[in-house]
Amino acid sequence: MRPTPQRRAVATGALVAVTAMLAVGVQTTSANAGQDKAAHPAPRQSIHKPDPGAEPVKLTPSQRAELIRDANATKAETAKNLGLGAKEKLVVKDVVKDKNGTLHTRYERTYDGLPVLGGDLVVDATRSGQVKTAAKATKQRIAVASTTPSLAASAAEKDAVKAARAKGSKAGKADKAPRKVVWAAKGTPVLAYETVVGGVQDDGTPSQLHVITDAKTGKKLFEFQGVKQGTGNSQHSGQVQIGTTKSGSSYQMNDTTRGGHKTYNLNHGSSGTGTLFTDSDDVWGNGTNSDPATAGVDAHYGAQLTWDYYKNVHGRNGIRGDGVGAYSRVHYGNNYVNAFWDDSCFCMTYGDGNGIPLTSIDVAAHEMTHGVTSATANLTYSGESGGLNEATSDMMATAVEFWANNPADPGDYLIGEKININGDGTPLRYMDKPSKDGASKDAWYSGLGGIDVHYSSGPANHWFYLASEGSGPKDIGGVHYDSPTSDGLPVTGVGRDNAAKIWFKALTERMQSNTDYKGARDATLWAAGELFGVNSDTYNNVANAWAAINVGPRASSGVSVTSPGDQTSIVNQAVSLQIKATGSTSGALTYSATGLPAGLSINASTGLISGTPTTTGTSNVTVTVKDSAGKTGSTSFKWTVNTTGGGSVFENTTQVAIPDAGAAVTSPIVVTRSGNGPSALKVDVNITHTYRGDLTIDLVAPNGKTWRLKNSDAWDSAADVSETYTVDASSVSANGTWKLKVQDVYSGDSGTIDKWRLTF
């Protein structure tokens, strides 16, 4: 079996009662505040409701655990179905279940017992376990010549420490001995060491620098930071309800209704857990810095809102989806102007800044989202994936801030607008035009992965704004925005709620550790297609938002016609060519063509060009397709008709059926030429098939010599084969019967060899 595209699943999430108490010193609203709609409406652009079946189920921890057990029980069979090597093993990381029955299982991989960095993948399957599609961080076959390193671990550690010290760490050695891994995130997989060096970065943030070193050559292959940094808003926001627990005669800042999330006071320390906040009367803080509990309430409340947002909007029960809460630490260091998420402690940490602690709604949402990203796609915190990691936290922080609907801190597309980090009242980041901060980028360019992740996040933040609200000037919630596009064309927004759902689905069900901007576009279009339909208004507007930041093309708003490429035929030999087109509206398409070679015509209803060319020469052909709304699309190509017998082109246009998971079939061409074949024999192949990854394709010479033109690929779910292959046929005689041999090796689909051609 191999992946066969389809969809999702159902369960119910248990809702728990909220034990809340009144606290003084932070925002005015309930933790269960609804979506901001009346106060801060998004412009009515093109906002549609998603397909509820494609949305995730609210799984309880026990339901999620059962799905993970099921995945573990079948992971060996899954690995076999995916065609993994004998030394490759799957490790279940997470399972997401959609309301229509599809299961999305996220795996990591090992090779001969070693972790494979960049080997993660997501497999979509039916409720019964039938694999449908899969998305992999790497398409390379995982294999290394040996798992015995040439380089000593001590040498790798020495180089890693040197790299960390160059970034401000004072550490003299690694946190622990380097571990052997297979590095597969970029290029050909190699045996490597991963070394983690601790210490403190230049700004006081803890460091966990991961350095990847080639275990044979000693070359540094990659490095990334394990501690994710972020920012937030003011602590002064009115009264709120927070979740606490009574213990004896006092109360603890321990929210047992949200996985036991606790908030601690570091009291200006920089290590350890700190002291759990307690209070005698369950009234916390006084709204100023004079009471350490004020910052604690802000952080606790922000974590509470973020938990509720993920659960109520996206069906995720906690950061890892297992119902277990993280914890928060406030008053880190002395005047530390930042906040961070740390996987090693499963916690958020907040500094006091320059008199304004970084402990409010959007900073909590930003940091907690780093945890969600780590538990799902685990976007590597470096290069383009690192920028996407940061942008994910900014997007979800913005979504949470709007969802909270707090009048003291209304939602906006500004990051850090109240902490005054710049000292002049300006925000830290702008989503409508990121370059306004002086460092972030508005659009993708080839060098984007080489800058700081907080600035390479700019284009993705810009995409989120454009996808949510659209381009151009507008006022939202009292804030003026004016969002440009890199191609100068307008973008229509799909609504903030829809944009957030699309990104979250892409993050949790499609993206992998090394996803770049192109991969993020692909993932969000997949998610938009699942939720709203491929070629829907929402799908096309999501694509246009990506085009507006220089990632991918604009979506067609009319008819899209696939170019068949230039054609070559033989005079007096029957041919056929199927033109493929899609429209953005329902209804039939109408086909017409100009410039066809004499003897050929096009079927106006089906788009099939057929006939027998009667005259040699080259024609310029244009095919035009019209939909029921009168919109048109076209494609142009050349069609050359050659003479037959002893010529350079030989073709077979007789269709041959390809049975599903059956025996190989062949299509012959009789070549009448003297001498041997050329060193660059061209083989043009046109096959109709709904899942081309099923197919192996071989060319067989008259003497039996065989060339493999195409291997099967369980991950290649695209339809049809229309390719030109080149082989060195200089060692075989050209004269005789050549064969195209095709076999469907996986069950689920069948197809047809439409035609193939040899050009000598």
From Swiss-Prot:
Which residues are removed as the propeptide when the protein matures?
A: 34-229
BP-aspect Gene Ontology terms: carbohydrate metabolic process; proteolysis
Q: Which cofactor does it need?
A: Zn(2+)
Q: Where in the cell is it found?
A: Secreted
SUPFAM superfamilies in the record, alphabetically? Answer: Cadherin-like, Galactose-binding domain-like, Metalloproteases ('zincins'), catalytic domain
Which UniProt key words apply to this protein?
Answer: Hydrolase, Metal-binding, Metalloprotease, Protease, Secreted, Signal, Zinc
Entry's Gene Ontology cellular component terms = extracellular region; membrane
**Residue limits of the P/Homo B domain?**
640-760
Which stretch is the leader sequence?
1-33
Keyword check for Metal-binding, yes or no.
yes
Which EC number(s) does UniProt give? 3.4.-.-
List of catalytic residues? E367, H454 (proton donor)
Q: Which regions are flagged for Polar residues bias?
A: 228-257
Cofactor: binding comment? Binds 1 zinc ion per subunit.
MF GO annotations: calcium ion binding; metalloendopeptidase activity; serine-type endopeptidase activity
Name the InterPro entries on file. Answer: Cadg, Cadherin-like_sf, FTP_domain, Galactose-bd-like_sf, Ig-like_fold, P_dom, Peptidase_M4, Peptidase_M4/M1_CTD_sf
Protein residues bound to Zn(2+): H366, H370, E390
- Pfam families recorded for this chain? FTP, He_PIG, P_proprotein, Peptidase_M4, Peptidase_M4_C
Q: Where do the record's region annotations for Disordered lie?
A: 32-59, 228-265
| Role according to the record | Cleaves the N-terminal propeptide of transglutaminase thus activating it.
Family membership, please give it: Belongs to the peptidase M4 family.
Name of the protein in its database record: Transglutaminase-activating metalloprotease
Q: From which source organism is this entry?
A: Streptomyces mobaraensis (Streptoverticillium mobaraense)
